[in-house]
């Protein structure tokens, strides 16, 4: 049995919002496995999904560079020790120059970057001189570049505070449609920066992930229903528990069965068959929406668009395809947040938490 420390309990509590004893018990039941403890709490309806932001620590900036012809988009992250330096004009210039250098030289790795030449000197030496001038340790943590294929287009967006950057690539069926899609892609990048989808579409979801999230979703809804039954508020009816959580689960057979049920309902209601074709599509869309809640939470195409929350990103793209007269397929997106995935430094809070256990 792994030792369950106060620090572990506090981290789990801050990540999930669950009670302290619930967190301690979850860690005990999962032998100290953080991710399994999160899942256990969620299946019991006691906590929310762990937020990536709860585990961010580093300071620094994310930078984005899009080529003038919209065929190459690069995003990079350079870390500093303090937020003060991250606002330094020289550091800001360093991040922009480095990102442009990466793109202009088609660099593929941090190691390749350090051995490259910039302004006549090795980048490694150039960075050391910047460190000496700025007065803090600086680290090029990561970068990535997306390239447009034939009739493709890329774009990017950097949030005003420089902590979040996004690049995106799309394939189109003509150069004209690709050119018209530039602004759309930038707006979708802004959506990604705000909503942080984890996947492109439901097709990218792992079935085990879907099944685990479905259990957590049902537990959460049942817990809310229990509270609504207790309050007996007529303005807050109970949630309908969905059969499924993602379009990944909606096979052709399941969709066919749902359609047949709708037809039976229409027949029972005495609706004439000649108007069924006008009713069935809307009811099928409602069925899919009710049973794909994970898609709207985790996937870009399934999320409601921040600039028009009555439409999904997928629907917005479909409308633009009609307007532009051609196909637009989002191929890939990359979103960097400063410090994402880095562990926090240990703080002196163990005694405070231990006193409550």
Curated annotation (Swiss-Prot):
SUPFAM superfamilies, alphabetized: Elongation factor Ts (EF-Ts), dimerisation domain, UBA-like
Cell compartment(s), UniProt: Cytoplasm
Leader sequence segment: none
Residue ranges, annotated region (Involved in Mg(2+) ion dislocation from EF-Tu): 82-85
GO molecular function, one term: translation elongation factor activity
One annotated Gene Ontology cellular component of this protein: cytoplasm
UniProt-listed Pfam families: EF_TS
Disulphide linkage map: none
Keyword Nucleotidyltransferase: no
Keywords, sorted A to Z: Cytoplasm, Elongation factor, Protein biosynthesis
Source superkingdom: Bacteria
Task of the protein: Associates with the EF-Tu.GDP complex and induces the exchange of GDP to GTP. It remains bound to the aminoacyl-tRNA.EF-Tu.GTP complex up to the GTP hydrolysis stage on the ribosome.
Family: Belongs to the EF-Ts family.
Protein name, as recorded: Elongation factor Ts
Species for this entry: Campylobacter jejuni subsp. doylei (strain ATCC BAA-1458 / RM4099 / 269.97)
């Amino acid at each position: 049995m792994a030792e369950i420390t106060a620090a572990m309990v506090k981290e789990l509590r801050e990540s999930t919002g669950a009670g302290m004893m619930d967190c301690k018990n979850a860690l005990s039941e999962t032998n100290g496995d953080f991710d399994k403890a999160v899942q256990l709490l969620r299946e019991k309806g006691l906590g929310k999904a762990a937020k990536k932001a709860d585990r961010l620590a580093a300071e620094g900036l994310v930078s984005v560079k899009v080529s003038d012809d919209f065929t190459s988009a690069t995003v990079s992250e350079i870390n500093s020790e303090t937020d003060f330096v991250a606002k330094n004009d020289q550091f800001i210039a360093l991040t922009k120059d480095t990102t442009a250098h990466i793109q202009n030289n088609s660099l593929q790795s941090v190691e390749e970057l350090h051995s490259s030449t910039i302004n006549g000197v090795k980048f490694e030496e150039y960075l050391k001189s910047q460190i000496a001038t700025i007065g803090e340790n600086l680290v090029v943590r990561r970068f990535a570049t997306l390239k447009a294929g034939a009739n493709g287009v890329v774009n990017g967006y950097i949030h005003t505070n420089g902590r979040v950057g996004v690049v995106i690539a799309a394939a189109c069926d003509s150069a004209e449609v690709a050119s018209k899609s530039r602004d759309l892609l930038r707006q979708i990048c802004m959506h990604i920066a705000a909503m942080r989808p984890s996947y492109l579409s439901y097709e990218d979801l792992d079935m085990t992930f879907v099944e685990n999230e479905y259990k957590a979703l049902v537990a959460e809804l049942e817990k809310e229903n229990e509270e609504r039954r207790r309050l007996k508020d007529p303005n807050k009816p109970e949630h309908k528990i969905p059969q499924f959580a993602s379009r990944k689960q909606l096979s052709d057979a399941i969709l066919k069965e749902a359609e047949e049920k709708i037809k039976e309902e229409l027949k029972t209601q005495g609706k004439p068959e000649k108007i069924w074709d006008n009713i069935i599509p809307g009811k099928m869309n409602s069925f899919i929406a009710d049973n794909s809640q994970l898609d709207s939470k985790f996937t870009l195409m399934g999320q409601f668009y921040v600039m028009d929350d009555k439409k999904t990103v997928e629907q917005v793209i479909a409308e633009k395809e009609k307007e532009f007269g051609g196909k637009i397929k989002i191929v890939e997106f990359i979103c960097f947040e400063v410090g994402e995935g880095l562990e926090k430094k240990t703080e002196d809070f163990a005694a405070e938490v231990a006193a409550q256990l």
